Amino acid sequence: MAKANKTAAIQFIRGVDEPVVPDIKLTRSSDGRTGRALFVFDQPEIMAPETWAGITGMFMLDEEGELVTREVNARFVNGQPSALEVTYIWKSEEDFERFMRFAKRYAACNGLGYSQN
């Protein structure tokens, strides 16, 4: 796994960036104040047997600081871990704006784009 050195990174163990880039889906309430981001990491490196037990949450790091969620769930196929599903919830417009600033930095670091469906 890569050591932390990007402008924006996701970590499951502090100090170790997860190199697998997730699929991210956003949903918002009708008034736009609350919502969630669902991250799906297919075959993330953190699911290796030697690191699996060290997951305590997902940490989104950038120049402004850190966003944290503890809602991390594993998906298994035929008894083997295959993916991580992580939910980040925001409860105010300010929280959403902060998340979007992180998301834009993370996208820029990983060559990602944004599309509305």
UniProtKB/Swiss-Prot annotation:
Q: What is this protein called?
A: Photosystem II reaction center Psb28 protein
* Cell compartment(s), UniProt: Cellular thylakoid membrane
Q: Does the keyword Membrane apply?
A: yes
Q: Name one Pfam family in it.
A: Psb28
Is Thylakoid there in the keyword field? yes
GO BP field: photosynthesis
Keywords for this protein: Membrane, Photosynthesis, Photosystem II, Thylakoid
What's its membrane topology? Peripheral membrane protein
Task: Report the sequence similarity comment from the record.
Answer: Belongs to the Psb28 family.
The record's InterPro entries line, in alphabetical order, gives:
Psb28_c1_sf, PSII_Psb28_class-1
Q: Which GO terms describe its cellular component?
A: photosystem II oxygen evolving complex; plasma membrane-derived thylakoid membrane
HAMAP family with a match to the protein in the record: PSII_Psb28 (MF_01370)
Q: How does it assemble?
A: Part of the photosystem II complex.
